[in-house]
């Protein structure tokens, strides 16, 4: 259950972080309206707060979160940007997720 809760929290955190970075990219690269910077800043503040909700040490949290972030970023690439994923994208995300699971499932006494 803890793994499921952490995975859901990591996924929400990743989406919020990506939104916070994607909106300024739209402003800079695609000349979208400047007001998009306000929800971007709010999104990044929410991202920082969400990271504090994770129960393990900060460094371990960030390391495990990285695996989820990679998978969510590739999902964003596919669903939002409309880019087809390659087998290399899928393989890389799989390796990252395995790494996340190794970190998250380590024994408490390790």
UniProtKB/Swiss-Prot annotation:
* Matches recorded under Pfam families: UPF0060
Keywords assigned: Cell inner membrane, Cell membrane, Membrane, Transmembrane, Transmembrane helix
What the entry lists under SUPFAM superfamilies is as follows: Multidrug resistance efflux transporter EmrE
Kindly list the places in or outside the cell where this protein is found, as annotated in its UniProt entry: Cell inner membrane
Transmembrane ranges, per UniProt, are 8-28, 33-53, 63-83, 90-110
Signal sequence range: none
Q: Which domain of life is it from?
A: Bacteria
Q: What is its main location?
A: membrane
Question: What is the membrane topology noted in the UniProt record heading this document?
Answer: Multi-pass membrane protein
GO terms under cellular component: plasma membrane
| Record-stated family | Belongs to the UPF0060 family.
Which HAMAP family has this protein been placed in? UPF0060
PANTHER family for the chain = UPF0060 MEMBRANE PROTEIN YNFA
Protein's name according to its UniProt entry: UPF0060 membrane protein Veis_0342
Q: List the source organism.
A: Verminephrobacter eiseniae (strain EF01-2)
Q: What is the lineage of its organism?
A: Bacteria, Pseudomonadati, Pseudomonadota, Betaproteobacteria, Burkholderiales
